[in-house]
C-alpha cells in the first residue's frame, strides 16, 4: 500500500542509554524517509553517547560501548539530521511519548532549534490502541480463544468476575508467570 503523503515522512526509532530525557543519550537512530512520490531512503546510525552504555541496555539492545566508540556524537550529527528532517512529518511506535521528546532534547543539547510543533507526529502505538478494542471481551477472546458472549452475559458483575478470572489464568499461562 502506498502512503498518501503531502510531505516527506520520517519513520524512525531510537535506542538510548536509558529512559531519562535529560540524563540519557541516543546510541542508535534508524529511519526511513518516505517521499510523497513513494521513494524511500533508509539510514541506520550508531551514535557515541559520550558515556558508558548501562549493562541492562546492552542486554536489551545488543549495542555495546565498542559498537559506538568510533561513532559520531549526536552534536556532530545534529546539523545533517536537522537538514534531512526539515519539512518532514514523523512516525514511530510509542514515538510521541519517548522518541520525539528524546530526539528534541538531543537537538536542544546540540544547539539546534528543531521545532516539532510544526510537523505532524504519527504514533503507530496510539493508532493501534484506538483501533484494537481494549476491553474485557477483547482480552477474553485473546487469552481464552473464545468470544465472551458465547460464555457469559456481559455487564453482570458475577459473570464479568468469572471472565476476568479466566483472562488472568490465560495471561499467566501464556506469559508463564508463577507468582503475582
What are these regions (language model features)?
Residues 156-167:
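Acidic, divalent-metal-coordinating active-site segment for phosphoryl/phosphodiester hydrolysis
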Residues 126-129, 141, 166-169:
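Generic alpha-helical structural context detector
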Residues 121-135:
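Short alpha-helix plus adjacent loop in nuclease-associated cores
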Residues 171-174:
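Conserved anion/nucleotide-ligand pocket segment
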Residues 178-180:
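Conserved small/polar residues in nucleotide/adenosyl-binding loops
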Residues 101, 125, 162:
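Active-site phosphate/pyrophosphate-handling residues
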Residues 1-118, 133-155:
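Conserved non-catalytic scaffold segment of RNase H-like nuclease domains
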Amino acid at each position: 500500500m502506498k502512503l498518501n503523503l503531502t510531505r516527506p515522512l520520517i519513520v524512525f526509532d531510537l535506542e538510548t542509554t536509558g529512559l531519562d530525557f535529560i540524563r540519557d543519550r541516543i546510541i542508535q537512530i534508524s529511519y526511513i524517509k518516505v517521499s510523497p512520490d513513494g521513494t524511500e531512503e533508509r539510514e541506520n546510525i550508531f551514535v557515541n553517547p559520550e558515556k558508558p552504555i548501562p549493562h541492562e541496555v546492552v542486554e536489551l539492545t545488543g549495542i555495546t560501548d565498542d559498537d559506538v566508540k568510533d561513532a559520531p556524537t549526536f552534536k556532530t550529527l545534529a546539523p545533517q539530521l536537522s537538514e534531512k528532517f526539515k519539512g518532514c512529518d514523523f512516525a514511530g511506535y510509542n514515538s510521541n511519548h519517548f522518541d520525539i521528546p528524546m530526539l528534541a532534547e538531543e537537538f536542544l543539547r546540540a544547539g539546534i532549534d528543531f521545532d516539532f510543533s510544526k510537523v505532524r507526529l504519527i504514533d503507530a502505538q496510539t493508532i493501534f490502541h484506538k483501533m484494537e478494542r481494549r476491553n474485557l471481551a477483547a482480552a477474553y477472546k485473546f487469552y481464552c480463544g473464545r468470544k465472551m458472549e458465547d460464555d457469559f452475559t456481559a455487564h453482570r458483575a458475577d459473570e464479568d468476575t468469572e471472565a476476568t478470572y479466566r483472562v488472568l489464568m490465560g495471561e499467566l499461562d501464556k506469559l508463564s508467570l508463577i507468582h503475582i
